[in-house]
Amino acid sequence: MHSNGTMLLLYALASIIILILMIAKWRLNPFVSLILVSIGMGAVTGMPLTKVLSAFQDGLGSGIGSTASVIALGTMLGKILAESGGAERIATTTIKIFGPKLIHWAMLVIAFIVGIPIFYQVGFILLIPLVFTLGRASGISLVKLTIPLCAGLATVHGLLPPHPGSMQCVEMLHADVGKTILYGFIVGFPAAILAGPLYGNWITPRIQLPAHNPFAESLEGSSDQDKNLPGFWLTIFSILLPVLLMVFSSGANIFLPHGNNIRAFMNFMGDPVVSLLIALLVSMVTLGFWRGFSSADLLKFTNDCLGPTAGILLLIGAGGGFSEILYRAGVSNAMADLSHVMHLSPIMLGFIIAAVIRVATGSQTVAMSMSGGMLAPIIFSTPGFHSPELLVLSIGAGSSILSHVNDGAFWLLKEYLNMTVSQTFKTWTVSVTIASIAALILTFGLQALGL
């Protein structure tokens, strides 16, 4: 690799270390820290300062993008579920079915199922109110409940179509969608078990969360706990409605041709913002008006819960700005070049390339799409390689590794659980890395079986 590429990697590493020190040791505001490090990274790599600022703003806008709408609508839906008693109904029923000792396993199963058709952030925002309610009702640590939730959602996001990164890899590598989904389940669920309930059990006693959690408190119901709670299935329907709409949209893309009006309509209905909006409006009726709440009550609920979301939106946006600076500076290409010169099997090479791009950019989707494009001409010329589905899985596994401060999901978990940066590394970063390595090992296992 050229010396320029080596210097880029050193600059990127230094910027990440400085960012961590700013936030964790020097206690500087994370949003301000991300701006300063982004400007510094752009300057030392030779970008004109005006272009540094425009790149950061572009990344910030793209980082927030529809995420702002998703977080706002999902938070409103969670608040209505809490105020109506719906979240409490799910919590009490879940505790009754699984028992307090198995609730964290239930969260993994729920996350794995719900996460199939939706983005990680959407699933997290949709299910985190349930985590808060279950934690309050059972007395179990939020860490023990949230780690399985995050592991399930993140694993599905990286390994299973119809998520955009894996779908792009399937198309570029000419893999079979059905086989990829089947192998993805075989690889993904055991990996999520290791990274979720098992690692969560180990790390929970080592993480002490603050007693005050503004997000949990903003989603607490204010009415009497002895009230008549809504039905379990009605509440489940309110949570799963956006998921069902997204599933129908994915099905339409598979079974209906381009240009079909029904497909276009289902794609519109299955958009995360539209599906959450529909679910919110339905819940306002079924869990709001039907249960005696007035329009003024619903307005108060939906306004009061939005305050704590401002900080996380800024951090997600700033993380996107930092990622854009790294991308435009050429860091991801330098990391890919470093991996490319190593003489490795396609599966190992796919894992490494996706991993280094993920670490550089903070995006699973970008890591998978770039890796698939780079590896397609290689595997087509590699004699004896007949497992593009396994290559898709290895790329997905690599794209999950070492999520850190340039990933919006890192800040999402940190803020919602009110953790420190150090605690977020110990929980989120380690968990997704365990899932990543486990998925790679299991992928090699499938290859050894001749699949």
From Swiss-Prot:
It comes from the Bacteria. The keyword Cell membrane applies. GO terms for cellular component: plasma membrane. GO terms for biological process: D-gluconate metabolic process. This is Gluconate permease. It comes from Zymomonas mobilis subsp. mobilis (strain ATCC 31821 / ZM4 / CP4). It is found in: Cell membrane. The lineage of its organism: Bacteria, Pseudomonadati, Pseudomonadota, Alphaproteobacteria, Sphingomonadales. Keywords: Cell membrane, Gluconate utilization, Membrane, Sugar transport, Transmembrane, Transmembrane helix, Transport. One of its GO terms (molecular function) is gluconate transmembrane transporter activity. Belongs to the GntP permease family. Pathway: Carbohydrate acid metabolism; D-gluconate degradation. It is a multi-pass membrane protein. NCBIfam families: gntP (TIGR00791). The chain crosses the membrane at residues 4-24, 30-50, 62-82, 108-128, 140-160, 180-200, 229-249, 270-290, 306-326, 337-357, 375-395, 430-450.
